[in-house]
């Protein structure tokens, strides 16, 4: 009896939630359901007679072709069911506007899809004034989803998210409402197709580019926008493209590129945040040559372009290039940087103080580490003593290998002994055993602190 009562009590809130949903006005209900995958919206039809056909009225579709894969082998009836479902949805209430159309193209291996239907669907959603269009092709090259011309002149489109699709060249692009573009593994047909797309978006605010394919036609990626606020660029390992960005209102820049030798920023005065993992095509294959002036000039101009940022994330690979450059030329001052995060992939910390000297107003520093266990450490922080006169907060975020504890303590000692106004230092030891952690804490207590108000926290 007690178990039955407990079961009834635990089930009641769920029923109450269903009742509350049933009593919602249609406009609010549809807004909630718009955030669910369409297959889950269809499942709601069993909960209420009112919801039997509710999926037809939701102003958006979020569908995976794979949702119709029932059998372990291909059956044409499944694809016909997919076609029928989408055509019914687009045909019903066809005069209303669509807020979202998200289609993930995934299907049985080695089965070709009739992608002509996708073009008809895209044309239909453009006619219904779609606001957010997300197309993800996950057939890995078996089928090529082509974005039709109508999409390039869709006046209602606000965001465009494309994955592994084909973008043909267009002589005319007009997307007057488009604010967000995400391009992931997108293939462009001809030279200037990418540039044409960006230039046809007069109110574009956010552009994210991840491993796009320019078909070996272009030698550069050109981004010119008077409205752009955020730009993220992740290059393919095989790309050797020059990247040129002219965006006078740009506030945020993310750059992840190991091959590109040149990244040119024009009108960079508004840049506030930067996330940089960029080595100017230098590394194990091409080492920094202090006598090669073109590379030095490119690095100098790039650093000057970053000199106005307030928040910066930088990789140890980029820091290494900056360190090499600093041995032949003076670094520009990063007077506005108040927050800095450095992601280390090795123990080359000797380059850190050089860069910190160029950040005279730095207040918060976070150090992350992704170092394989057993990797040898290096002597750190050689040279004359350098006081850190503005630093208030230090956090060593990601735990390192336990065998690196002595080297880690040297790094902690550096900040405690050289930071004049340090208020808080946080040390993460989550990967350490209790005994090891106890030893480290005891050693921490013996390290002198230049700042009398500094507190050390161990997590």
From Swiss-Prot:
It comes from the Eukaryota. This is FBD-associated F-box protein At4g13985. The lineage of its organism: Eukaryota, Viridiplantae, Streptophyta, Embryophyta, Tracheophyta. Residues 375-429 form the FBD domain. Residues 18-64 form the F-box domain. It holds the Pfam family LRR_At5g56370. CDD domains: F-box_AtFBL13-like (cd22160). SMART domains: FBD (SM00579), FBOX (SM00256). PROSITE patterns: FBOX. PANTHER family: F-BOX/RNI SUPERFAMILY PROTEIN-RELATED (PTHR31900), PROTEIN WITH RNI-LIKE_FBD-LIKE DOMAIN (PTHR31900:SF33).
